Design a protein with these regions (language model features):
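Extracytoplasmic small-molecule ligand-binding "clamshell" domains
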Residues: 1-51
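An extracytoplasmic/periplasmic, membrane-proximal ligand-sensing/linker region
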Residues: 1-7, 195-260
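A ligand-binding cleft/hinge motif common to bilobed small-molecule-binding domains
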Residues: 44-57, 110-116, 149-177
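Short beta-strand->loop
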Residues: 60-70, 126, 170-188
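A bilobed periplasmic-binding-protein/Venus flytrap-type ligand-binding module shared by bacterial periplasmic
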Residues: 74-85, 189-204
Length: 260
């Protein structure tokens, strides 16, 4: 993160910014605290957590972020090829693994797909916990590698994460490529977003936006962007991406109210 800070700060002297530092948060709750107490000015996040920070800590969306050339991604829900499961409706009475409660593509988006099918869901502490016949049991695997392995070993019946993680899985494991199959692909959501504190001065916000929008065409920013989660550019939300974000915002609220 620091190389991009070092690129941005010298270009903001005209609005009074002369230094910057990186402050890491262990989870979204700590980042909310930082924002409310004025300890953080600029946050980069996946859209699910970014919208949560906007709703609960007053953060303002600034720009959307292109990473590794991708402006959006989807979630996939997959099963073992021998499971006999070919449709989301067949997950009733079964189990699904997600990555973590803060993940957009490996929790919020696939969970929303299940909710849209009106499938009741119940949290499990462990994949070995007994299944409830009238709901979809869900459990957090903590890492994408665990998630895929649990489905492959039949510890759970299904898993959900991003299409980019799925593509990576297909490249690195012949066994996973042979034995796992996607049964559902969601609509796309923006890949990532930049947010600023609700207390940021308008002139500072405008200058930060200007600097970030120009970074992808500035050779001096190339290495800093690469180290910033392989960012390849920043862009303003258009009507289509705004609609995607609003749908995700409503869905995330529903998921949190119903499941958390």
């Amino acid at each position: 993160l620091k190389p991009l800070i070092d690129y941005v700060v010298p270009r903001m002297k005209d609005v009074g910014i002369t230094e910057g530092r990186v402050l890491m948060a262990r989870d979204p709750q700590q980042m909310m605290s930082y924002l409310r107490r004025g300890k953080v000015d600029w946050v980069t996040e996946t859209p699910g957590t970014g919208l949560l920070l906007a709703d609960r800590a007053g953060a303002r969306p600034l720009l959307l972020t292109e990473r590794s050339g991708s402006r959006e991604y989807r979630s996939v829900i997959f099963t073992h090829r021998d499971s006999g499961i070919t449709d989301l409706s067949q997950l009733l009475g079964k189990t699904i693994a997600f990555q973590s409660p803060s993940s957009t593509s490996a929790y919020l988006v696939p969970a929303l797909a299940l909710r849209e099918r009106r499938l009741p869901m119940g949290l499990m502490v462990s994949p070995l916990e007994g299944r409830e016949p009238g709901s979809v049991g869900y459990v957090f695997a903590n890492t994408d590698a665990n998630l895929a392995a649990w489905v492959h070993k039949r510890l759970v019946d299904a898993g959900g994460f991003s299409d980019q993680d799925w593509d990576q899985l297909q490249r690195v494991s012949e066994a996973f490529r042979r034995d796992l199959v996607v049964i559902h692909t969601t609509d796309p959501v923006p890949r990532a977003m930049e947010l600023v504190s609700g207390n940021m001065a308008p002139a500072v916000e405008a200058r930060l936006k200007e600097v970030l929008l120009g970074a992808s065409t500035d050779p001096q920013a190339r290495d800093a962007l690469r180290q910033f989660f392989r960012t390849t550019g920043f862009y303003e939300a258009d009507p289509a991406s705004q609609a995607q974000l609003e749908k995700l915002r409503r869905g995330a609220r529903e998921i949190r109210e119903a499941l958390e």
